[in-house]
């Protein structure tokens, strides 16, 4: 049985690390543009549970996954292979 490396993107939602192309900040103009395009193409996945979107994960299938975790937090999780949920990383508002 093969082992898959996964990334917890918040609230128990996971993404296969091998499918991630990039992780970008959600507040740039280009991020907003590709987010609107993905929404119109039905390729937008919202994993924020209604919280503020802080990062956008782009996959190799051109799907966009919205996360409430910061880009830096997601990168740290990938680098350390640590997918435990720290309370300061998830916005509880």
UniProtKB/Swiss-Prot annotation:
Domain of life: Bacteria
Coiled-coil region list: none
Family: Belongs to the RemA family.
Protein name in UniProt: Putative regulatory protein LBJ_1616
Lineage: Bacteria, Pseudomonadati, Spirochaetota, Spirochaetia, Leptospirales
């Amino acid at each position: 049985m093969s082992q898959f490396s996964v990334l917890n993107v918040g609230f128990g939602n996971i993404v296969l690390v091998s499918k991630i192309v990039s992780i970008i900040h959600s507040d740039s103009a280009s991020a907003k543009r590709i987010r609107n395009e993905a929404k119109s193409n039905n390729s937008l996945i919202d994993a924020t549970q209604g919280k503020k979107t802080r990062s956008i994960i782009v996959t190799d299938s051109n799907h966009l996954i919205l996360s409430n975790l910061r880009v830096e937090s997601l990168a740290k999780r990938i680098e350390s292979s640590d997918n435990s949920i720290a309370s300061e990383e998830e916005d509880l508002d």
